[in-house]
Amino acid sequence: MQSWSRVYCSLAKKGHFNRLSHGLQGASSVPLRTYSDQPIDADVTVIGSGPGGYVAAIKAAQLGFKTVCIEKNETLGGTCLNVGCIPSKALLNNSHYYHLAHGKDFASRGIEIPEVRLNLEKMMEQKRSAVKALTGGIAHLFKQNKVVHVNGFGKITGKNQVTATTADGSTQVIGTKNILIATGSEVTPFPGITIDEDTIVSSTGALSLKKVPEKLVVIGAGVIGVELGSVWQRLGADVTAVEFLGHVGGIGIDMEISKNFQRILQKQGFKFKLNTKVTGATKKSDGKIDVSVEAASGGKAEVITCDVLLVCIGRRPFTQNLGLEELGIELDPKGRIPVNTRFQTKIPNIFAIGDVVAGPMLAHKAEDEGIICVEGMAGGAVHIDYNCVPSVIYTHPEVAWVGKSEEQLKEEGVEFKVGKFPFAANSRAKTNADTDGMVKILGHKSTDRILGAHILGPGAGEMVNEAALALEYGASCEDVARVCHAHPTLSEAFREANLAASFGKPINF
């Protein structure tokens, strides 16, 4: 990937900044939320302010482009910040604290609390506070970087024009040299089940329940299903996840890790019905919901009764009413916008990134695409190695991986070796009395190059970034094994697993 400093130097030599600075003076006088009879002129117009969109807008402005970002919602940050990644992590963190205090964990550490009570409204208030601070932070960054924020639904009304429309019908026209679509994704509906965000909820509703349900059924045991199911299970709900596939954790997870992960969640009280499909859901007169299920291959029907039904079978690209059809931009069979390696659509000055294009629907993937996309507009190199994009499940313990799984390597016919190290043998995990899980490293059998890293355990979401860096630089298992890691730390388990992969045995197990 071409470094950002080179892009800046390249632009400076071309006089790009001087040429655009005059335009930026005009942009700085435009309010963050503006509607006028006069069109706004821009070099780059970003539709959507989620992780991909807002980062792309800021980067474009930093590169000297006169930049506009259009957002249909009142707050910036998209799904991730408002009703996704951020609020779910607040609830996951706080529900974990409650679980430790309410169960036997604290007592086993010599911390005796006579009575632990859940104040759900206070917990939700802390979640909202975190979201508000971060959405306000984006608004501040826009102002600081002179990104013009236009509130409204953005539609491409010409190859060089975007029109933003508010709920009251007011419009703002933006004339623009480049258009970047970063509209993200939306919840995939379940045929025959209507979401009311009260007792039949999507991930959005599950983040704002008014009380802890007695019984919760989750359709889908992927990342979102196990995360949100964990929140309410910790807070006292009886949770059952119904999953069509034969494993938990979604697509891409290593099967050995998945089996161990499922075992740990079940030990916590989480129930699973795998290889099972939901055939319908009926609300009863008493407010409860009968969920009809049967084996994925067909068979005897069964009914599970619950207070709340959470539908999380995935997400789909949000591309409706963007004006793509009028421009002749056709979607692929999965509803995604086809782009080339520079994120250009069939119309060269219209780009797309994030959940609306191919690849994993991850916030950090969208951020990377946003940055390199606008660097490409400025003449920089455009490259991203999707094999180095990590995935994380923020349960406790966490699950994280980057690179290939064992199943993928077998399917591709790649010869590999495996190194494992359990957290039960890690000093820091022992002192923390938090020893579930392991680190699993997959290395090339002859070259020793790291091909994949799979972590189940405390702090996996942080540790996986060391693995991502190693993969990005093409490191061998021995390279990591010979890097001195501080003691006692959880990351020593990562080093030990690489020792096991490279030399056949770890030191401490």
Curated annotation (Swiss-Prot):
It catalyses: N(6)-[(R)-dihydrolipoyl]-L-lysyl-[protein] + NAD(+) = N(6)-[(R)-lipoyl]-L-lysyl-[protein] + NADH + H(+). The modification N6-succinyllysine is found at residues 66, 104, 122, 132, 143, 159, 273, 277, 410, 430, 505. It comes from the Eukaryota. The active site is at residue 487. Keywords: Acetylation, Cell projection, Cilium, Cytoplasmic vesicle, Disulfide bond, FAD, Flagellum, Flavoprotein, Mitochondrion, NAD, Nucleus, Oxidoreductase, Phosphoprotein, Redox-active center, Transit peptide. Pfam families: Pyr_redox_2, Pyr_redox_dim. One of its GO terms (cellular component) is oxoadipate dehydrogenase complex. One of its GO terms (biological process) is dihydrolipoamide metabolic process. Tyrosine phosphorylated. Disulfide bonds join 80-85. NAD(+) binds at residues 220-227, 243, 278, 314. The record marks 448, 473 as: Important for interaction with PDHX and activity of pyruvate dehydrogenase complex. Gene3D superfamilies: 3.30.390.30, FAD/NAD(P)-binding domain. Binds 1 FAD per subunit. InterPro entries: Class-I_Pyr_Nuc-Dis_Oxidored, FAD/NAD-bd_sf, FAD/NAD-binding_dom, FAD/NAD-linked_Rdtase_dimer_sf, Lipoamide_DH, Pyr_nuc-diS_OxRdtase, Pyr_nucl-diS_OxRdtase_dimer, Pyr_OxRdtase_I_AS. The active site is a redox-active disulfide bond. Homodimer. Part of the multimeric pyruvate dehydrogenase complex that contains multiple copies of pyruvate dehydrogenase (subunits PDHA (PDHA1 or PDHA2) and PDHB, E1), dihydrolipoamide acetyltransferase (DLAT, E2) and lipoamide dehydrogenase (DLD, E3). These subunits are bound to an inner core composed of about 48 DLAT and 12 PDHX molecules (by non covalent bonds). The 2-oxoglutarate dehydrogenase complex is composed of OGDH (2-oxoglutarate dehydrogenase; E1), DLST (dihydrolipoamide succinyltransferase; E2), DLD (dihydrolipoamide dehydrogenase; E3) and the assembly factor KGD4. This is Dihydrolipoyl dehydrogenase, mitochondrial. It comes from Rattus norvegicus.
